Amino acid sequence: ISECDAGIFDAMNKGIKLARGTWINFMNAGDFFSDTSILERMKEYLIKSKADIVYGSCYRYHPFYSYVKVPGNLDLLKKGMEIPHQASFIRGAVQKKHLFSLRYRLAGDHDLFLRLYLQGYSFEYVPVLVCIFSLEGVSNTRLLEAYKETYLVLTKNKVADLKSMNSKLKYVRGYVGCLCEMMLPTNLKWKLKAMKKELADKTKTNRRY
């Protein structure tokens, strides 16, 4: 279908309502499956799975900084977006019951996954590199808006309380961090991100030994 909508999540909701398949996956402009055999490979897992949401890893791409994101502990959803919707497959019956909230322009997918997690729906990780995800999308270029919406998601779902001083301080620190990041030249910003991740990976490796 091609028609006016109230944003990306409104358009995705329209697709959900029309979908007739057992599983639903959304791949946005600029993102794509990691190779042409992914759907066949995922089919093997989806047929056997008893979970409500099945997800894999994704390759996050930027000209200055690229890496494979393997989702961690689901409790991290209480802090931010941990599972890219491009790498996830949600049962159609579940997705139709829980549409994306139109309250958000950027963080609607985070809100959906957090709601499903808090309501006890089952998640299953599978060792498949599902998609290639562009880091030049709106959630990475509109940092302040994305950050504000993340905190709205957390407060709405009652995993953060901006009335507490501790939460307020965390929010302010994060907000200032976004402002500083926006002032950096693009290539420097992504090079610093790459260095930070490399250091974090080395720290994890050292802890194992």
Predicted regions and their residues:
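Membrane-proximal basic amphipathic "stem/tether" segments
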Residues: 158-209
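Short aromatic/hydrophobic "clamp" motif used to bind/position activated sugar donors
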Residues: 24
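Conserved nucleotide-sugar donor-binding catalytic segment
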Residues: 56, 66-149, 153
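Conserved donor NDP-sugar-binding/catalytic core segment of glycosyltransferases
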Residues: 32, 36-67
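Active-site acidic Asp-centered loop
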Residues: 3, 27-29, 107
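Acidic donor-diphosphate engagement hotspot in glycosyltransferases and nucleotidyltransferases
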Residues: 12, 35-41, 50, 108, ...
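Glycine-rich, basic loop-to-helix element that forms the pyrophosphate-binding segment
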Residues: 2-19
